[in-house]
Amino acid sequence: MKPIVKYNVEEPYCSNKIAPFNSQNTFLAREVLPYYAVLPHVGRMDDIWGSYILQYYFPNSVIYNKASVYQDRNVQDLVTNLEKEVIGYRNTYNFINNLQKYMDNLPEEAQHFYKTYMKAYE
C-alpha cells in the first residue's frame, strides 16, 4: 500500500535561506527561465540542484504554497531511487556552500548541458 502524504498549507510561505524545490507543480517567472534547468547526469538531484542554481542568481525568491494539483505517484523502486540520490547525500552540502563555483561542482556532462541551455537564451 502506498502512503498518502498531504500537507495542510493554508497560506504561502517563504524563507530568506536557500531551500530546495523540485520541478513538479512549480511555477516560474519568465525572467528566471534561463537560470533554471532540470540537470542531467546528477541522479535524482536533477531538479533540486537546478533550484539551488536559480537561487544563486535570484536569492530570496522562492515562495511555497499548497499544490494546485494532486500527483498520483507511480510505483517506485526504492533501492534504485536511493542509488540515484547518493550523489546528493555526498555532494549537496558542498554544492550549496560553493554556489559561486557551481559549474565546477557539476559532472562534466551536466556542465556541457547547462552551458548549451544558457546559450539558447542569449
Predicted features, each with a name:
Residues 2-122:
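C-terminal catalytic/acceptor-binding lobe
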